[in-house]
């Protein structure tokens, strides 16, 4: 049995509250996934990930990257360890991408054919080949609860003709991905529970070593809607993938440099077509206000490296206070001058009222600031540490700074999704 998706409360704008049942647990939707590229959410230990957020529930699901784990330490090693959950001692659901986006981002280091993609490792220049079948083989070895069909992410901008051809390749690869998955889905490492128990398996409730937990369960496979920035191609791609009957559907190829209003339009057009009884996943987005907006539109799943990447560069998200909102609105359209005057940057679209601010902890104005990052945030960082201390850690290049910054930003994102879930329940009760 693959995933089971329950849809509960829904709003007039299309947002819905639900629950995604997966082999390693139940995830409340809509939700945001922290990105654990190389089987680690950078700078944040797993036990901390399980507890961050206002309610202490932590991240219910995280993402790992197939391309990076294939190159190092290798999918066969991870298979021998019992899968990526056991390898990294994570007892909650996981998703792996197909590796396609990373391969195609190599540009000069890859060659695309109908069979797949030949590419050179960014680590040592060695030559490799990813086909849909090989991507599935690697993802089955990793053993995440959800895996993605192999796809081509077209460059931006691209002509309609180039985008159509790329989309056709994605559809052909999706069919091949599904065919291989259906034939080999019982080969997932945790299906047999043949790996001996180790310290990394003895998690708090011991459930990773419980053979009955996974009996009759398999991974789930999502198809990825492409079509660039062309609504007609997006529709065609969604309809073609629906015919293939995937467990869920992702909207890919967005947040690659296009204006925010185009991103929103492509998501809205695609959501109109995708089936309501399957989870809907927008890949690689976005800023705090954007993930809240997309969840209210009916997106169930999102991921992005932004909260942790920004944190490592000293950029922290916080709630805008009432007076600041007006000041930020006044600065909209003034571009850099407005940002310099305020020392911060709002994170919404150009026609929206900002509710989240991205602050630069490196600024000298925080050197003696004894306030927390966000007085309204209940994360452990905001409960204990001052802006002055966090600035000191960053300027001194202390590793703890990256950890604390990342914990706060992730908690900020997870709390946004918790609030949206509450809004959807409340809207359904009115």
Language-model segments: which ranges?
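C-terminal extensions of enzymes
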Residues: 1-21, 27-34, 43, 151-157, ...
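Active-site pocket-lining/capping segments in soluble small-molecule metabolic enzymes
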Residues: 90, 95, 100-107, 113-124, ...
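Glycine-rich phosphate/ribose-binding loops and adjacent secondary-structure elements
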Residues: 184, 216-222, 226-330, 343-373
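Non-catalytic, usually N-terminal nucleic-acid engagement modules in DNA/RNA processing proteins
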Residues: 1-187, 364
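Conserved, mostly hydrophobic/aromatic
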Residues: 25, 62, 97, 139, ...
């Amino acid at each position: 049995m693959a995933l089971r998706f329950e849809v509960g409360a829904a709003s007039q704008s299309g947002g819905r509250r639900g629950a995604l049942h997966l082999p390693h647990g139940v995830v409340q939707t809509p939700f945001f996934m922290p990105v654990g590229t190389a089987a680690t959410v950078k700078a944040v230990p797993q036990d901390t990930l399980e507890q961050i957020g206002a309610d202490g529930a932590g991240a219910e699901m995280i993402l790992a990257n197939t391309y990076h784990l294939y190159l190092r330490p290798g999918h066969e090693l991870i298979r021998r360890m019992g899968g990526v959950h056991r390898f990294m001692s994570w007892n909650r659901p996981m998703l792996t991408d197909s590796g396609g986006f990373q391969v195609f981002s190599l540009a000069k280091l890859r060659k695309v054919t109908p069979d797949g993609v030949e590419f050179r490792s960014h680590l040592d220049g060695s030559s490799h080949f990813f086909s849909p079948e090989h991507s599935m083989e690697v993802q089955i070895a990793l053993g995440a609860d959800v895996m993605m069909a192999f796809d081509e992410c077209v460059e931006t901008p691209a002509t309609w003709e180039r985008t159509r051809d790329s989309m056709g390749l994605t559809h052909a690869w999706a069919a091949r991905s599904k065919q291989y998955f259906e034939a080999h889905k019982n080969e997932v490492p945790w299906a047999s529970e043949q790996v001996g128990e180790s310290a990394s398996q003895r998690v708090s409730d011991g459930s990773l070593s419980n053979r009955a937990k996974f009996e009759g369960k398999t991974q789930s496979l999502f198809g990825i809607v492409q079509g660039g920035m062309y609504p007609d191609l997006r529709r065609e791609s969604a309809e073609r993938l629906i015919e293939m009957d995937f467990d869920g559907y992702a909207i890919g190829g967005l947040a690659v440099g296009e204006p925010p209003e185009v991103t929103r339009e492509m998501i809205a057009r695609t959501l109109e077509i995708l089936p309501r009884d399957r989870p809907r996943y927008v890949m690689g987005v976005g800023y705090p206000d954007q993930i809240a907006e997309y969840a209210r539109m009916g997106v169930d799943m999102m991921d992005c490296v932004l909260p942790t990447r920004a944190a490592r560069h000293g950029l922290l998200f916080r709630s805008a206070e009432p007076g600041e909102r007006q000041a930020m609105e006044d600065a909209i359209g003034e571009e850099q001058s407005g940002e310099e005057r305020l020392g911060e940057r709002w994170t919404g679209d150009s026609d929206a009222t900002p509710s989240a601010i991205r602050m630069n902890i490196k600024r000298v104005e925080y050197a003696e600031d004894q306030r927390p990052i966000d007085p309204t945030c209940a994360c452990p960082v905001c409960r204990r540490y001052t802006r002055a201390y966090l600035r000191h850690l960053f300027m001194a290049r202390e590793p703890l700074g990256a950890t604390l910054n990342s914990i706060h930003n992730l908690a900020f994102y997870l709390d946004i999704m918790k609030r949206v879930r509450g809004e959807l329940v409340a809207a359904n009760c009115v």
